[in-house]
Amino acid sequence: MFRFAVLFLTLLICFAALSCQSYSTGLQQSLARADETAATGTLHTIATAQQTYALTNGGNYDTFQQLCEGGYLDTRFNSDKPVIKDYVLSMEVGRDSDGPFFRLKADPADNGTKPGRHFYIDQSRMMRVNASQPASASDPIAQP
């Protein structure tokens, strides 16, 4: 009888340990999804700021710093690569044969240690996503 009690107790401890690991993994994934939600919301906000800026500036787009100076974005964005909720934002603005453009990316701040997808948006306002590397215009559209 004692052996069965020890075996039962051992199995119970193993089950509890596995449950804790599963719970911890779930929490990490939840935090990553919350950070992703903040990042995508921020990208949409910046894209809206760019569209508004373009309306009053000949259709041109501008940098984070210029958008902040003009009051289109708050001071959190007043750098070349602002960091929002563990995502590093980067933006390219310019003009090509199709006219003015902006390309905005959000990449996880710690690629190797934290889960997170990479996001991209441009003047088309289509959010694109890549699970393993910085996203671009050729990546699939992000699904809700």
What are these regions (language model features)?
Residues 1-4:
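Positively charged n-region of N-terminal signal peptides that target proteins for export
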Residues 28-29, 48-115, 121-127, 131, ...:
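Extracellular/periplasmic head regions of type IV pilus-like filament subunits
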Residues 7-17:
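Bacterial N-terminal signal peptides
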Residues 18-52:
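Amphipathic alpha-helical segments typified by the pilin-like N-terminal helix
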